[in-house]
Amino acid sequence: MEEVKNTKLIGIGNEGIKKLEEVESKIVEKIDTEKININKDVDKDYVRALLDGVDILLLTYNSEDKQALQIVNAIGYMADERRVLSVGLDLSEKENKNEIKINREIKINNDNTDSSLNIIDMIIDSISDECTISIDLTDIKEGLASDKGIKYSYGEFDKNNSVEEIANKLEESAIKTSDELTGKKLMILVEMSSVYDIAYLNEVLNAIQDKSDDSYEAIFS
């Protein structure tokens, strides 16, 4: 299993930096942060130092800002060379039709910021040694690094929710990044207290898998 050394969140351009500052207090314990102004000279030596020891790279930016996008691509190109998983959090509401050099781009706005951060937080936990059942970083990369789209959802539930209700709500609230999906992995990340037993959890997992395509390889943390 690959050792996870570091996760870094970089705010690029005015809007990217503003979003980073907005969420920084929620993630600072687990993620290193960096702010890059569009006037910054982003040369190879700077990017190498930026990526040193990093396994997962998150970038916040507005894809309508062409200068910010150039910086994103410069960092993403070298991240790919170093086999760093790069995920862009694009603040623009418009579809980004420009060439992008990162592994995965997700639209982020005021409505989905908290849920997106929760998913990122759970991904980071899922590949850590402290996780009860961890996922290999290679599986995360394989699931996210593709030219095709992904579908993802997040929900918070308690024992008042039936197993079927949980599976249905997750399916109904799912967001697609494009119509054509990778069809590779079904990743189920669960955070729960000890009041829930393994049998109940197994029912939930089976219900979620029943809602998905049979061709998906399911992995769980």
Identify the role of each PLM range.
Residues 1-221:
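Tubulin/FtsZ superfamily GTPase core signature
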